[in-house]
Amino acid sequence: MRKKDLDDSGMHHIHEFLHGRMYWQYKQEEIEWQDKDYNKFYTMYDFAKKIGGDKVEVINLVPAGTEPHDWEPSTKDLIEMEKSDIFIYNGAGMEQWVDDVLESLDTEELTSVEASKGIKLLKDQDAHEHDHEHNSENDPHVWLDPQNAKYEMNKIKKALIKVDAENKDYYEANYKRYAKECDELDTLYKEGTSKLTKKELVVAHEAFGYLCHAYGLEQMGIEGLSADDEPDPKQMSEVIRFAKEHQVKTIFFEELVSPKVAKTIAKETGANAKMLNPLEGLSNKKIKAGEDYFSVMKQNLAAIKEALSE
């Protein structure tokens, strides 16, 4: 938490980091609390910012533009996590390190939120065929179904209310606003995909299972559930065969992963190579430009409609 001092005008100014409970005992009448909220990658960061608004300080442990499958916390990160009030992570196998870290931390004052817990998880169809670095057989990319995104925002809202009950109405109002946006996004996807005659997507890695499941599409991943899985010759041949068989005209790559393999397959099959963003991370440039979960998901929908209409 941060200590805030009041000046004569009643304005609050951030002064320094302190351990919240100690400071609360002595200065309760002089400060307003701003909960510190740590999360693991862009989507969790975005959801926490939306629900927490100006009542929380949200810190994304994963640097902008970093592929989160590869990331692990540093000693400095662990120290900062122990000082926080809430730690948000996706779960479902996305963060391979999280169980060990939570066991090692002094978590008596830390509320941890596994945002995907309770969602019906899809299985990795290739779990027994490929040696993925993901040691889970579950697909963790739940947020690419807008209804799952709404569910995760609700989990975050409940955690914030638990820690900061005084601002319950504020968090409830923010959740209501963004839950409505999730429903509207879901409607856009249903309407946008319902009349498509083609249903097959070739994607950089198998991150789009929940999106495909929600809207009757099919994905063929060049790589597995982890974006850094390298396709072997057999997988490359299967992808090329699939693309030709289904007359796929667009091979999708991602923002945070080299497009080299996708472009190679596109050249081999006479297709275009374009971006489809799984929202595991965004570049600083896009964040500064105001991009968020909803804007990127709408861009994804436009890309899918174009690809499946060719």
Predicted regions and their residues:
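Extracytoplasmic metal-acquisition and chelation regions
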Residues: 1-310
